C-alpha cells in the first residue's frame, strides 16, 4: 500500500531548550520511506541519532522561541499480516537478549499490577490467540475519548476509567500481554484510518520469533501502519520530547492512501 504522510508541528518556547524530534518513518523489511522531506521553518538541527533498537532516527533540535516544522514523505507498506491465532509463544529462555526488556514492567505499563486480572479473564489461552483476545477486550471495553488522559496517564489509570486515546489503548494492551509473559512494545506510527487524524500508537508482540503489529483501537491494520519508532512505552517513543517548556500552538497529521 502506498501512502502519503504529512505532519505539521508548531510550538512556542518561553526560553531556549533542546528537543528530540522523531517523525520520520523507518525503512525496514515491511515498509520503505521514499522522498522524506523535513522542513524546519524555525528551530535548528544539532545532531541525528538512532532510535530505540536502531529503528528510525531521532533528531536533536534546539528551539529558541518557536518550533515550526513540516514533514512529508511517501511510504510503501509491503507488510503482510500474520494470522495471530496461528502464532505460538517463543519459549522465554529462547528470547533474544534485546527482547527481554519488553517482558518487564515500565513507567506507563505496570504489568505486575495486572497479573490477577489476566490470569482470570484470559485463562486457557496462549500465544497469538491470547493476544487477539486481549486486544479485542480492550477495543470492546474502552471508549475512545480525547479529553480523558494526559501525558502522565498510565495503563492502570486507563484501565480504571476504560477511556483514552490510542496511546492509552496501547499501554493497557502492553501491560496485559507482558503480565502473561509475552514480550510487547510500544510503536509510534501513522495510519490512514485514524479518526480524528493524528499521530498514532499501536503495539508489537513477539511471537514465533518475530515482532507482529496489533492495533487495539481497530483503526489500523498491519498492512497500512507506517512505523516510526519503538520503545517500552510512550516514554521511549514519543514524536517530540522537550527538555524545557514547549507550548503547543498547532499540530496536524494527514495520511492518505495513494494505491493499494
Language-model-detected regions and their locations in the chain:
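Intrinsically disordered, low-complexity N-terminal segments that are enriched in acidic
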Residues: 1-84
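Short low-complexity stretches enriched in small and charged residues
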Residues: 22-32, 88-91, 157-163, 167-170, ...
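Short intrinsically disordered coil segments
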Residues: 24-26, 85-94, 217-221, 243-245
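Short, surface-exposed linear segments at secondary-structure transitions and domain or protein termini
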Residues: 31, 44-46, 93-95, 221-230
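Short, surface-exposed, polar/charged, turn-prone segments marking secondary-structure boundaries
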Residues: 33-41, 47-51, 66-68, 97-102, ...
Amino acid at each position: 500500500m502506498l501512502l502519503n504522510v504529512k505532519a505539521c508541528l508548531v510550538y512556542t518556547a518561553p526560553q531556549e531548550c533542546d528537543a528530540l524530534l522523531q517523525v520520520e518513518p523507518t525503512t525496514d523489511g515491511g515498509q520503505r520511506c521514499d522522498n522524506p522531506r523535513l522542513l524546519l521553518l524555525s528551530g535548528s538541527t544539532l545532531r541525528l541519532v538512532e532510535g530505540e533498537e536502531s529503528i528510525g532516527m531521532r533528531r536533536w533540535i534546539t528551539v529558541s522561541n518557536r518550533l515550526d516544522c513540516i514533514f512529508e514523505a511517501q511510504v510503501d507498506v509491503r507488510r503482510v499480516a500474520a494470522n495471530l491465532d496461528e502464532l505460538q509463544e517463543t519459549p522465554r529462555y529462547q528470547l533474544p537478549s534485546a527482547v527481554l526488556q519488553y517482558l518487564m514492567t515500565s513507567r506507563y505499563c505496570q504489568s505486575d499490577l495486572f497479573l490477577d486480572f489476566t490470569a482470570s479473564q484470559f485463562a486457557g489461552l496462549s500465544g497469538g490467540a491470547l493476544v487477539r483476545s486481549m486486544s479485542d477486550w480492550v477495543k470492546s471495553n474502552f471508549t475512545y475519548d480525547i479529553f480523558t488522559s494526559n501525558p502522565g496517564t498510565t495503563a492502570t489509570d486507563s484501565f480504571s476509567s476504560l477511556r483514552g486515546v490510542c496511546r492509552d489503548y496501547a499501554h493497557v494492551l502492553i501491560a496485559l500481554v507482558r503480565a502473561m509473559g509475552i514480550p510487547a512494545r510500544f510503536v509510534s506510527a501513522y495510519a490512514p484510518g485514524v479518526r480524528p487524524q493524528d499521530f498514532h500508537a499501536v503495539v508489537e508482540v513477539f511471537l514465533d520469533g518475530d515482532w507482529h503489529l496489533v492495533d487495539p483501537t481497530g483503526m489500523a491494520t498491519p498492512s497500512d501502519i507506517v512505523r516510526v519508532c519503538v520503545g517500552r512505552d510512550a516514554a521511549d517513543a514519543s514524536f517530540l520530547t522537550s527538555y524545557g517548556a514547549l507550548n503547543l500552538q498547532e499540530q496536524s497529521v494527514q495520511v492518505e492512501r495513494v494505491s493499494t
